Design a protein with these regions (language model features):
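Short, acidic/polar
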Residues: 26-40, 98-110, 157-167
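Catalytic alpha/beta core domains of metabolic enzymes, predominantly
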Residues: 123-187
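N-terminal amphipathic alpha-helix/helix-capping segment at the start of soluble metabolic enzymes
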Residues: 1-33
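Glycine-rich, proline-tolerant flexible connector loops at the mouths of alpha/beta enzymes
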Residues: 45-74, 121, 128
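Alpha-helix-loop-beta-strand connector modules within alpha/beta enzyme cores
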Residues: 60-90, 113, 135-146
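Catalytic domains of carbohydrate-active enzymes, especially glycoside hydrolases
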Residues: 33-53, 116
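Structural preference for beta-strand elements that scaffold enzyme active sites
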Residues: 18-20, 45-47, 81-83, 116-120, ...
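Glycine/small-residue-rich loop that forms an oxyanion/phosphate-binding "nest" at active or ligand-binding sites
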Residues: 74, 82-121, 128
Length: 187
């Protein structure tokens, strides 16, 4: 892992924290409209939470083609770095666990088509071999990787957090990310 990650004109790990705005709209029209709006704001990064878009869609090859087309539309609007995220239900997102194989296929399609600048992979949702394969594919296509873990019900023990972050680093992601819900001052 490097200390400074350069994505387009943004350097993560250098100077001031960066502002990232999520896009949680459900239709292509709403997604494009919102990105046009936030692109005018003083933000650094856009995160497309595709789990909101995919929540009510029956997955098929057309879904992948739509994601590619949406990414092309987004790139016409903004030059800001874009994170592609499909957050699982258990980590605060909209995707159910029965969508697993589709998640892997969509990530592969997004990576091979160089649709986005970064992808966010959940360490406790995806199988380790799938994470390794996706990271390898992402590196081959010059796409940065975030490995994340979220728990919005509690903060795990310090030992568990250190274990998770070390595992993320061992998997050779570009950016390890954890987000937990503090319940008391100790957290």
């Amino acid at each position: 892992m490097e200390n400074i990650i350069k994505i387009k004109n943004i350097k993560l790990g250098e100077s001031a924290p960066k502002i990232c705005v999520p896009v949680i709209e459900k239709t292509e029209k709403e997604i494009i409209k919102y990105i046009k709006y936030i692109n005018k704001l003083p933000i650094d990064i856009i995160e497309w939470r595709a789990d909101f878009y995919l929540e009510d869609i029956i997955y098929n090859e057309e879904s992948e083609i739509n994601i590619i087309e949406i990414s092309k539309s987004i790139k016409k609007i903004t030059n800001k770095p874009i994170i592609f995220t499909m957050r699982s239900y258990k980590e605060g997102g909209k995707l159910k666990s029965d969508f697993y194989n589709n998640i892997i296929d969509i990530y592969k399609t997004v990576i091979k088509n160089k649709c986005f600048d970064l992808i966010d992979l959940e360490i406790l949702t995806l199988k380790e071999r799938d994470i390794k394969n996706l990271i390898k594919l992402a590196k081959e296509n010059n796409i940065k990787t975030i490995i994340s873990n979220h728990d919005f019900n509690k903060t795990p023990s310090k030992k568990h957090i250190v274990y998770i972050i070390n595992k993320m680093i061992k998997l050779k992601c570009d950016i390890p990310k954890v987000a937990y819900m503090p319940k008391n001052k100790k957290d």
